[in-house]
Amino acid sequence: MDALIKPLRAGKPDAKPADPKGTEFRPAELDPAEFLAAAVKPDQPRPSRGEAEQAVKTLLAYIGEDTAREGLLDTPRRVVEAYDELFQGYHQCPAEVLNRTFGETAGYDDFVLIRDMSFTSHCEHHVMPFYGKAHIAYTPVERVVGLSKLARLVDIFAHRLQTQEHLTAQIAAAVDEVLKPRGVAVMIEAEHTCMSVRGIAKQGAVTFTSRFTGMFRDNPAEQARFMSMIRGGR
């Protein structure tokens, strides 16, 4: 099931219809600036670390905690340090990860698939973790990218506040834009703690999203082969 990505900004028109020649790969509603560059600019105004720690202290007081007790004295600092790690993707550039490619393909003309890349991200609605596996396939034209680069790409986008649909679309769009392959297939399966530990509390529920471009979008047989290779051997 191809994830239906709605316009991500208010007032933006719906995505353009697919080009019949299969040349319009990138979802029209995604601005390249949001998936090719670091999300935070070096000169972008930001709260100070002290202000961030004070915000954590305020939240602790809001839930009724005594922020002066021994066990919580260093909690604001620890939380801010954890945020630096969990959301480091805002300071990383996805395009740079994919820019180094190799031309020694010996005429290889089938798709390349990396499956079961584990990741943890945080939903933008409740800032709670969701985690699972990402599967990426692409069919190179002349050059291929190092296998670890696709895993790093997943990590960059996962280390930002996300929805699973947006994460899926960003990964596919970045691979399409930088590598210019014949097609890209991305599938993500994840469990969301905002659904499993709060609200309806349905533990074990898994959400699937996918995005197909180019030869994958236009050829259901290639989609089926991609899916069967993901499931093979499990």
From Swiss-Prot:
<comment type="subunit">
    <text>Toroid-shaped homodecamer, composed of two pentamers of five dimers.</text>
</comment>
<dbReference type="GO" id="GO:0005525">
    <property type="term" value="F:GTP binding"/>
</dbReference>
<keyword id="KW-0547">Nucleotide-binding</keyword>
<dbReference type="InterPro" id="IPR020602">
    <property type="entry name" value="GTP_CycHdrlase_I_dom"/>
</dbReference>
<dbReference type="InterPro" id="IPR018234">
    <property type="entry name" value="GTP_CycHdrlase_I_CS"/>
</dbReference>
<feature type="compositionally biased region" description="Basic and acidic residues">
    <location>
        <begin position="11"/>
        <end position="26"/>
    </location>
</feature>
<feature type="binding site">
    <location>
        <position position="194"/>
    </location>
    <ligand>
        <name>Zn(2+)</name>
    </ligand>
</feature>
<feature type="binding site">
    <location>
        <position position="123"/>
    </location>
    <ligand>
        <name>Zn(2+)</name>
    </ligand>
</feature>
<dbReference type="InterPro" id="IPR043134">
    <property type="entry name" value="GTP-CH-I_N"/>
</dbReference>
<dbReference type="GO" id="GO:0006730">
    <property type="term" value="P:one-carbon metabolic process"/>
</dbReference>
<dbReference type="GO" id="GO:0046654">
    <property type="term" value="P:tetrahydrofolate biosynthetic process"/>
</dbReference>
<dbReference type="GO" id="GO:0005737">
    <property type="term" value="C:cytoplasm"/>
</dbReference>
<dbReference type="GO" id="GO:0006729">
    <property type="term" value="P:tetrahydrobiopterin biosynthetic process"/>
</dbReference>
<feature type="region of interest" description="Disordered">
    <location>
        <begin position="1"/>
        <end position="26"/>
    </location>
</feature>
<dbReference type="GO" id="GO:0008270">
    <property type="term" value="F:zinc ion binding"/>
</dbReference>
<keyword id="KW-0479">Metal-binding</keyword>
<protein>
    <recommendedName>
        <fullName>GTP cyclohydrolase 1</fullName>
        <ecNumber>3.5.4.16</ecNumber>
    </recommendedName>
</protein>
<feature type="binding site">
    <location>
        <position position="126"/>
    </location>
    <ligand>
        <name>Zn(2+)</name>
    </ligand>
</feature>
<keyword id="KW-0554">One-carbon metabolism</keyword>
<keyword id="KW-0862">Zinc</keyword>
<dbReference type="GO" id="GO:0003934">
    <property type="term" value="F:GTP cyclohydrolase I activity"/>
</dbReference>
<keyword id="KW-0378">Hydrolase</keyword>
<dbReference type="InterPro" id="IPR043133">
    <property type="entry name" value="GTP-CH-I_C/QueF"/>
</dbReference>
<comment type="pathway">
    <text>Cofactor biosynthesis; 7,8-dihydroneopterin triphosphate biosynthesis; 7,8-dihydroneopterin triphosphate from GTP: step 1/1.</text>
</comment>
<dbReference type="InterPro" id="IPR001474">
    <property type="entry name" value="GTP_CycHdrlase_I"/>
</dbReference>
<dbReference type="Pfam" id="PF01227">
    <property type="entry name" value="GTP_cyclohydroI"/>
</dbReference>
<keyword id="KW-0342">GTP-binding</keyword>
<comment type="similarity">
    <text>Belongs to the GTP cyclohydrolase I family.</text>
</comment>
